[in-house]
């Protein structure tokens, strides 16, 4: 894949069930208040560490607030060599109404 794909929550959930990595690019306090279960918080401070440790061929879903900022972040990951990248349409706001049982809080990643 040379570009990322925009996907709805249902497609993202199917990918999660197959082991996709979810990264949440919202600010740390917002992430801690509630995020997709299993999502890793990634920001400008830890993005280099995330990239170094990542399997570039594993599917990665990028989530933000509403699905806008995640598109830029997904494009950046593709530019860094990731081959299977998705942007969550509707972001966390749509996710939490679609899958309220798939939300965690706190800083655990």
Swiss-Prot record:
Location(s) in or outside the cell: Cytoplasm
Record carries keyword Transferase: yes
RNA-binding among keywords: no
GO MF, any single term: thiosulfate-cyanide sulfurtransferase activity
GO cellular component: cytoplasm
CDD domains, alphabetized: GlpE_ST
GO biological process: glycerol metabolic process
EC top class, as a word: transferase
Annotated active site: 64 (cysteine persulfide intermediate)
Record's catalysed reaction(s): thiosulfate + hydrogen cyanide = thiocyanate + sulfite + 2 H(+); thiosulfate + [thioredoxin]-dithiol = [thioredoxin]-disulfide + hydrogen sulfide + sulfite + 2 H(+)
EC number: 2.8.1.1
Domain Rhodanese: start-end pairs: 16-104
Alphabetical list of InterPro entries matching this protein: GlpE_sulfurtransferase, Rhodanese-like_dom, Rhodanese-like_dom_sf, Thiosulf_sulfurTrfase
Source taxon at top rank: Bacteria
Keywords: Cytoplasm, Transferase
Alphabetized Pfam families for the sequence: Rhodanese
Function text: Transferase that catalyzes the transfer of sulfur from thiosulfate to thiophilic acceptors such as cyanide or dithiols. May function in a CysM-independent thiosulfate assimilation pathway by catalyzing the conversion of thiosulfate to sulfite, which can then be used for L-cysteine biosynthesis.
Entry similarity comment: Belongs to the GlpE family.
Alphabetical list of HAMAP family matching this protein: Thiosulf_sulfurtr
NCBIfam families the record matches: PRK00162.1
Protein name: Thiosulfate sulfurtransferase GlpE
Annotated source species: Pseudomonas fluorescens (strain SBW25)
